[in-house]
Amino acid sequence: FQAEDGIRDDLVTGVQTCALPIYLLRKLVINRSNQVWALDTTYIRMKKGFVYLTAVVDVHSRRILAHRTAITLEAIHAVEALAQAVARFGRPDIVNTDQGSQFTAQEFVDMVQGHGVKLSMDGRGAWRDNVFVERIWRTVKYERVYLRAYETVSEARQDIAQYIDWYNTARPHSSLGGLTPEQVWIGGMPTLELAA
């Protein structure tokens, strides 16, 4: 009966998930901060093991609005990061994610829709749909993570948080006209149009 209602049980985690929303960003003109936020999770290698880093990114400014570093890949970390971003910055028009189990979990979907926000999801395996976050992951890893060998989760969490603060406030981006994400967040920049 769950399949008939658009609900499936995720076989990997046992988390009840939602019917997948469609991708809403195709040909969307993104011309202001707080219009579209993207969430994604990546793994960060440590000296022994790894942690998961989930971030909320404003697509217009590339600013990382909130993040969570955790030892498990659960919906609660995405929910908490999104709740922190909404509390600090208001709500966007659209939240875009991939189809990871933490984002298809009913808990996360309810959080997004409960704020009156539209939920958009990339096509399965379509990394280009979330290219802004993928670029940020590359930057975080090459400029910080790969230069470290984190001993503890606490050390990773603290160091990544320091880097994200620097990334937002001091690191200029060529794609942002040499401005930092913070400068664009505050002052705006020319309109971005996503490719078809």
Positions of PLM-derived features:
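Single conserved hydrophobic/aromatic residue that forms the stacking wall/gate
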Residues: F1-C18
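Acidic active-site catalytic centers that drive phospho-/nucleotidyl reactions
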Residues: D40, D58, L82, D98, ...
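RNase H-like two-metal-ion nuclease catalytic core shared by retroviral integrases
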Residues: T97-Q99, F103-V112, L119-K141, T152-A161, ...
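Active-site beta-loop-alpha junctions of metal-dependent nucleic acid enzymes
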Residues: G49, H67-F89, I94, S101-T104
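Short small-residue beta-strand/loop micro-motif enriched in glycine and branched aliphatics
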Residues: S61-H67, L119-D122, Y146-L147
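Buried hydrophobic side chains on well-structured beta-strands
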Residues: R62, V95-D98
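An active-site-proximal beta-strand-loop segment
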Residues: I30-L65, I71-L73
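C-terminal domain-tail junction helix/linker
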Residues: Q113-H115, T139-A196
